[in-house]
Amino acid sequence: VSAPIRDLPELHSTKAARLLAAAGELLIGRGAKGFTVADVATRAHVGKGTVYLYWPTKEDLLIGLIGRAFLHLLDDLIDRLSAEPDLARPSRFCPAMLQIATSQPLVAALQRRDDDLLGVLTDHPRSIALDGALGPAAVLGAVLPIWRRNGLARDDWDVDDQNFALRSLITGVAFSMFGPHGGAGVDDPMAVLAATITAILGPERANQKQLRHTAAEIIAFLRDAQLTALGLISSPINE
């Protein structure tokens, strides 16, 4: 677990951990509109007042759940890149990021704007800020220049246009696999995604030193992103 995540209260309090687990189960099972703070307390076997010791409002608790989903997404990417710098290749990084993101139900729900699940959280300023700073589009926007500098993406194409093409590809693949009519229609959609990324970005010409440098740069960005997430979880922004 990365250093920023170690500061979360649930890692030091079993009550906080139970409350988060209970709130997560209720959110996934009933949607944001389908339960109260009292329901969370009952499921966690604590008094209602205990919830407010950690989260002043239900809104803060739910934003905390979404923020933690992003934190764990980033932490998973950091762990994988640290163990295997070759994962920094675009053809490997993008499928890995998509798989990790879609394995986090709240991140996936935010990407598809699932109002039934998220309710007011769908358009909440802090949800929007979390996705804008830490979502797949934000991560791609940060790592594309790193790839271009290190021989992993062609640099003869306007970076904004290149980023748009890449985001459109990944969004389309995600929708085809996990949208309302899910089912990609191919045996290995991630292999197709990897090949298409290479077709868009060009051959990955980086040597091992460049790959290690790329992985280190991406990890540094992801660690900064975790700090951003923690700030958004703990400090409401002007709404």
Give a label for each model feature.
Residues S2, A138, A142-N150, F175, ...:
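C-terminal peripheral helix-coil segments that are non-catalytic and often amphipathic
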Residues H12-A23, V40, L65-L73, L77, ...:
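Generic hydrophobic, amphipathic alpha-helix propensity
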